[in-house]
């Protein structure tokens, strides 16, 4: 989804967006998925299917069927820390959730839907489209 020939301006906008939205309830899951995609070039279908059992905390890596992805470089620290924060007792790193809004309190919360099912690839595509609109890309 991210073209290799993105202009530097677009890359900067996306990197700033990732930094700004990494703790935002609505965007944090997508932003982590996007960060993994930008580092690895993995297809969103593969990213949503990452299982927690394949995350090696000791070696700072994720084992995929045909690939081992290392997060051992110093500039990977923020991304790895976010992966560790996201990791849980669920089967998948990105399991099914929904956002519950409380307009009266101007508050939103990510609510678990199914710990045994991965987030759909459509979630990534939908949020990617929203991000492009927000950033005027």
What annotation goes with each model-predicted range?
Residues 4, 8-44:
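Basic, Lys/Arg- and aromatic-enriched nucleic-acid-binding interface segment
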Residues 37-59:
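Short, charged phosphate-coordinating catalytic segments
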Residues 50, 82, 86, 127, ...:
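Residues in the recognition helix of alpha-helical DNA-binding motifs
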Residues 4-5, 69-73, 135:
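Helix-turn-helix-type domain boundary/helix-start signal
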Residues 58, 63-117:
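Basic, alpha-helical nucleic-acid-contacting "clamp/cap" segments
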Residues 19-26, 40, 114, 122-137:
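Short, basic (Lys/Arg/His-rich) helix/loop patches that form interaction surfaces
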């Amino acid at each position: 989804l991210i073209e290799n020939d993105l202009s530097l301006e677009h890359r900067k906008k996306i990197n700033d967006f990732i930094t700004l939205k990494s703790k935002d309830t609505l965007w944090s899951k997508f932003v982590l998925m996007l960060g993994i995609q930008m580092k690895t070039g993995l297809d969103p279908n593969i990213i949503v299917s990452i299982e927690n059992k394949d995350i090696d905390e000791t070696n700072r890596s994720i084992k995929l069927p045909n690939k081992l992805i290392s997060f051992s470089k110093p500039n990977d620290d923020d991304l790895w820390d976010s992966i560790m924060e996201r990791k849980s007792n669920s089967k998948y790193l990105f399991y099914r959730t929904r956002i519950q809004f409380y307009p009266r309190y101007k508050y939103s919360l990510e609510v678990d839907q199914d710990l045994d099912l991965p987030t759909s690839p459509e979630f990534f595509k939908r949020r990617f489209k929203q991000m492009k609109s927000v950033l005027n890309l």
